[in-house]
Amino acid sequence: MISPFKDKGFSLLFLTTVSASLGDMFMDVSSGWLVLELTNSPLSLGLFWAVRSSPNLLFGMVGGATADKMDRRKLLIICYTLYVFCGLVFGFLIISGLIQLYHALALIFIRGIIRTFENPSRQSFIVDLVGRANAMNGISLNAVGMRGIGIVGGALAGLIIELFGKEWPFFVLSGLFLVSVFLVASINSVVTKRVAQQLSVWRNLEEGIQIVSQNKLVLALMLMAATCEMFGFSFPVLVPVFARDILKVGAIGNGMINAFRSGGGLLASLALASLGDSRHKGKLLLVMFLMFGVGLILYANTPIYVFALIFMGMVGVSAAGHDAMSQILLQLNVDEEQRGRAMGMWQLSIGFGILGSMTLGSLAEAYGAIFAQSVFGGLMVLIVVLMYLTVPKLKEL
């Protein structure tokens, strides 16, 4: 389980993930709460999260192709530096009293574009550092850092908002991303033999499309990722609504719900890392998908805050488990030089979350948050049953 930490580069990248993930959690919790305070509208929250997801759809494959073309270390440094500036602009707009919904939408869109380059670079860089044999351990342990710090990040962001104001989490997250810049800069570049480095980004894009058209298993994994993103990972849209209007627990409660989500994710990541190179990756993927849907239904229908936290922990376990297994299976079912583009295709798949975010927000505006979230959880259960019956090869992975 701990073998990847023998590599100094992986250890530094792990610390980078911890710092950057704390910044990400601050951004998600604080910006979602900000939008609800500005608009008092679930539909606006849906729009906000749709804008956040849209760059994945527009630039996902470009980001993956660029990760195969460029030095991944240098690309990560650029991405984290740009995150610093996004956080500072957010903070100064709030403290000046100028912040409007369109500012938040523009900044979260820019942040989303950066993420389409950062995520495939970071995930592919993990495998560069630890090798394909340790890919499951490396990716799972990296997820441990991400989910583990999210427990602190969710609760801390809510506390900072309550005690010091809405602007301070954005200044703190800028400092965290600056730490990430210095950590990545300390990693020695890993030179891997990549045919993609000899090709243009557009040629890499063409080859990415060919991978999907020729590899039916990759297509199935992308479809699962897309539907999971639409109906499962859209749930953060309504977390501020559940916290403020249904459970009546305020900004701190909103942070705690996100903390339990990360806590569940931490448990899943630790479990996957301890499994090593499991022979049942496909079955695990299907189980996580099913748990995700059931967890959302239970979370949406409990009026008791403590139970809501427990069910959100269940959602966190299944969300993190599905995320990790999806990324691992994509990287292991393509050629070595195609891993960046594989992650770009995954990024493209999760871009379909834009449809889920807008639909969930619209349903909540019209029929209430409980109904909307329950419908999406039910659709998750239906989809995984259909995938189990129609794609038998998934069970064999």
Predicted regions and their residues:
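Helix-loop boundary and gating motifs at the non-cytosolic
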Residues: 1-55, 214-261
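Helix-boundary and loop/linker segments of multi-pass membrane transporters
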Residues: 2-7, 22, 96-98, 197, ...
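Substrate-agnostic recognition of the 12-TM MFS/MFS-like secondary transporter fold
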Residues: 11-28, 51-65, 71-86, 103-161, ...
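Transmembrane alpha-helix termini and helix-breaking/packing motifs in multi-pass membrane transporters
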Residues: 32-38, 91-96, 152-172, 245-246, ...
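Helix-breaking motifs and short loop linkers at transmembrane-helix boundaries and internal kinks
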Residues: 39, 71, 93-98, 301-303
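C-terminal transmembrane bundle of multi-pass solute transporters/carriers
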Residues: 58-61, 69, 73-75, 79, ...
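Helix-loop junctions on the cytosolic side of multi-pass membrane transporters
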Residues: 124, 128, 170, 174-199, ...
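Short amphipathic alpha-helical coupling elements at transmembrane boundaries
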Residues: 127, 140-143, 203, 207-214
